[in-house]
């Protein structure tokens, strides 16, 4: 019989010393991988949380713009029928209801310009429209804070890698006034 180098014991597996203990090198590699994985999981959770918050703030802006759309017809009725401003308000309401994001901002600014021309108007429809617009502006400010926080993180390591892999995108920053 030939003598085995290990005297009948199992051969140690790769990365282990003959006593079966995990080598320091393997332990270091496992630790580094765990730390890197933890960093990326934390980054993804952060992006998920702030994307959700920015999306909720964006939905609030949309809801407040819907309130502006509801207030516009009553204010337009206080103007002379067929006037260019009344028609512009009606068009702006349609755009705010169905337009693209950029078109909605432009329409909002048009309504703001018309309201500024009639700043002395203290009638209830004008007051209701101003209140709805003020609420929309406050919602836009809250949205911009969330979007800015997310956009600042999304370009930094490790968030940029997680953003590319996860399909996260920057949120647009805008101003209603």
What are these regions (language model features)?
Residues 2-177:
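A helix-centric hydrophobic-segment signal that preferentially recognizes long
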């Amino acid at each position: 019989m030939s003598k085995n180098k290990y005297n009948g014991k199992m051969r140690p597996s790769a990365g282990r010393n003959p006593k079966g203990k995990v080598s320091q090198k393997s332990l270091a590699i496992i630790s580094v991988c765990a730390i890197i994985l933890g960093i990326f999981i934390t980054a993804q959770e952060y992006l998920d949380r702030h994307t959700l918050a920015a999306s909720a703030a964006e939905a609030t802006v949309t809801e407040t713009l819907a309130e502006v759309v509801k207030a516009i017809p009553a204010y337009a009725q206080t103007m002379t029928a067929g006037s260019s401003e009344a028609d512009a308000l009606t068009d702006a309401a349609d755009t705010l209801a169905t337009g693209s994001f950029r078109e909605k901002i432009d329409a909002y600014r048009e309504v703001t310009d018309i309201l500024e021309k009639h700043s002395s108007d203290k009638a209830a429809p004008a007051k209701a429209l101003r209140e709805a617009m003020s609420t929309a502006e406050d919602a836009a400010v809250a949205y911009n804070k969330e979007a800015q926080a997310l956009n600042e993180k999304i370009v930094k390591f490790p968030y940029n890698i997680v953003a590319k892999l996860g399909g996260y995108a920057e949120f647009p920053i805008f101003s209603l006034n």
